[in-house]
Amino acid sequence: MKNNLAIKFIAILVMSYLSCGSANASCDDAPIDGVDYSNCQFSEGQDLSRTYIPNSNLSFVSFIKVIFDKSIMMNSILINGNFAESSFFRANLYEANLEGGNFEKSNVTSANLTRANFKGASLIEATFKDSNLFESDFTGANILNANFEGANLNNAIWIDGKKCNLGSIGKCIK
């Protein structure tokens, strides 16, 4: 009987240990791979340059005027986040989901946004100069006065849901 209880206790400990392996974080925790900052509010104007947070959940967060220059954020979820006036200069957002996000007046110059999802995002006056937007999806996004000078838009899905042809550098050619 005691052995049976001991085995159950050890099994519970092992299961508890295994279930604690995720990278869920409170809003005060340091950024790491796979961190979950969903619904957090952060101070404006922070410098988070060179932050390494791939595979992270940043949905519904507020990062206004935050600097993410040269950060690694590939495969991260940034849906419905507020990144207004933030900087992503040379950031890697490969296959990131930015659906419904606010990136108004953000600097996304020379960034890797290959296969990024911008569906329904507000990109008003955002700058994507010289960025790689290959196969990104802009369906329903607001791109009023956005700057795509020198940006690779090859095979991107444009705001009207139509695919940009090869040779779409700086503007979508359909």
Walk through the language-model features, giving the residues of each:
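Detector for methionine-enriched segments
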Residues: M1, M15, M73-M74
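Bacterial N-terminal signal peptides that target proteins for export
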Residues: M1-I10
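Bacterial N-terminal signal peptides
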Residues: I10-C20
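Tandem repeat scaffolds
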Residues: A23-K174
